[in-house]
């Protein structure tokens, strides 16, 4: 009796992205790998987007959730900011490439006129609002600054203006939002850019499909850096 050998289905890959700047700046990297996203998440209500490659799809998630989707295998790979990865901890993730996209910086800012340097020098205990609690805690601990951290999910600039906090820790790109709210940067914490993150199991099981995409991303990111 002749045995019929079934041909294996191509391995589908799922890429996790967040809307906005990271999505827009990832598109050229995908195109360098020969992949085009066929739908716009800004105009579509769909959370799963198809691409020109039938075996690659994109899921749209919150920026802070990208590492979690990749960690647990709901996505094979994703793009996330260094800020998000530091808060997540990076467990279960392979981070092979700094893509040099969505660049900004993480800084401490205060209301214009607040003498931050003197407060720190005098050992004052400062209240700080941020959504980057883990990173802020490590930063201030390393400097020996006493702080009470308050976690917010947005509108950090409002904190010092209404007396909720003395300072904020947030991402800064041009600084225009700070200036519009009479805040000034007083301390630079780190430079931020977005990284490619890959599920460790997927890297082993789907290496043949993933490797060409990873290589294309790396080459394209080097050209743009």
UniProtKB/Swiss-Prot annotation:
* Domain of life of the native organism: Bacteria
UniProt feature coiled coil, ranges: none
Enzyme class per UniProt: transferase
| Entry GO terms, CC | cytoplasm
**A single BP term in Gene Ontology:** L-histidine biosynthetic process
- Places the protein is found: Cytoplasm
The UniProt record lists the EC number as 2.4.2.17
- Provide this UniProt record's keywords sorted from A to Z: Amino-acid biosynthesis, ATP-binding, Cytoplasm, Glycosyltransferase, Histidine biosynthesis, Nucleotide-binding, Transferase
Q: Which SUPFAM superfamilies match?
A: Periplasmic binding protein-like II
Per the record's keyword annotation, is Transmembrane helix included, yes or no?
Answer: no
Q: MF terms per GO, please? A: ATP binding; ATP phosphoribosyltransferase activity
Domain notes from UniProt: Lacks the C-terminal regulatory region which is replaced by HisZ.
Q: Which family does it belong to?
A: Belongs to the ATP phosphoribosyltransferase family. Short subfamily.
Query: Could you tell me what this protein is called?
Result: ATP phosphoribosyltransferase
Which source organism does the UniProt entry give?
Herminiimonas arsenicoxydans
| Gene symbol of the encoding locus | hisG
């Amino acid at each position: 009796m002749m045995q019929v050998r079934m041909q294996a289905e191509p391995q589908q890959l799922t890429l996790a992205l967040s809307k906005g700047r990271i999505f827009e700046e990832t598109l050229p990297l995908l195109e360098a790998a020969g992949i085009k996203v066929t739908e716009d998440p800004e105009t579509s209500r769909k959370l799963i987007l198809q691409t020109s490659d039938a075996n690659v799809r994109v899921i749209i998630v919150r920026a802070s959730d990208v590492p979690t989707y990749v960690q647990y295998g709901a996505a094979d790979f994703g793009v996330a900011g260094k800020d998000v990865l530091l808060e997540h901890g990076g467990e279960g993730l392979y981070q092979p490439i700094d893509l040099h996209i969505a660049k900004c910086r993480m800084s401490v800012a205060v209301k214009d006129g607040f003498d931050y340097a003197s407060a720190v020098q005098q050992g004052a205990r400062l209240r700080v609002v941020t959504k980057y609690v883990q990173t802020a805690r490590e930063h201030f601990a390393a400097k020996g600054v006493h702080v009470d951290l308050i976690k917010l999910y947005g509108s950090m600039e409002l904190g010092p203006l209404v007396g909720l906090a003395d300072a904020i820790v947030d991402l800064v790109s041009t600084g225009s939002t700070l200036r519009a709210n009479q805040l000034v940067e007083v301390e630079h914490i780190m430079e931020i850019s977005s990284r490619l993150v890959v599920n460790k199991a997927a890297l082993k099981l789907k290496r043949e499909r993933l490797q060409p995409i990873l290589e294309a991303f790396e080459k394209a990111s080097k050209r743009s850096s």
